Amino acid sequence: MSNAQQHLEKAIQIHPEFADAHYELALILKDKKEFEKSKEHFLKTIEIRPEFPVAHFNFALLLHEMKDHKTSQEHFLKAIDLDQNFANAHYHFGLLLAELEDFEEAKNNLEKATDIDQNHTLAYYHLAKLLIDPEDYEKAKKNYLTAIDIDESFADAHYYLGKLVASGLKNDKDGTLVRKPEYEDAIYHYKQTISLDKKYSKAHYNLALMYKIQKKYDDAKKHFEKAIEIVNDYSKAHFHLAMLLKETGTITADEKPSNKEEASVG
């Protein structure tokens, strides 16, 4: 007998009602993608020990992977009912609800996760991604910034914060819909994304758009080209690079001839 699975199976053979052994074996089988066998042992665990919040939680995760969303929801709720401060249960339940397009309940659960665990980076991040209404602009921005404050190396949080502030679509104090792009902040966060992941093609593309707006054409061209180098079939990058080259006559500032050279032409 040489591995954990074999010993757990032996423990269950000796003591069939050993809840912890069924639970640990279920986790191993889940990791091995043996989902049906894992499910059997989670069910047995819960049958023996119904008030086992972590078992309900991990069973819910398994059921989510198995696309049994209804039963998954039931076990997330059971885990939360048994442990009101189970941040990860709220977090993963929130992700499932978002996948099922129940966005309000998803936001409620992600926010609850951050209330319980104020260092739950991913909960802040995914909550921010769901806060797409212009009236939630500042709240979304705050959640991205909190995620970044906890984990400065969170490239996706920098990227999506860059997109948010680049759009600048929000409600003014009187409720009027306004667009107030924060281009310098967007550029900063796109640059941070690229510094963390040099092959983040979308960050190069969006940074190029910012530079194009600012008429920094050489920088824009450089990052459009970089996006295409990373993802050759990036159609939007090809299109906007083409429009940039058309707009600038394909001659960038660095390529323009000097006055002396101009005089000698023709």
What kind of region is each of these model predictions?
Residues Y159-K173, F239-M243:
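Amphipathic alpha-helical repeat scaffolds of TPR domains
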Residues L122, H126-K129, D156-K163, Y188, ...:
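Eukaryotic tandem repeat interaction scaffolds
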Residues M1-K10, D31-K44, H64-K78, A98-K112, ...:
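Structural signature of tandem alpha-helical TPR/SEL1-like repeats
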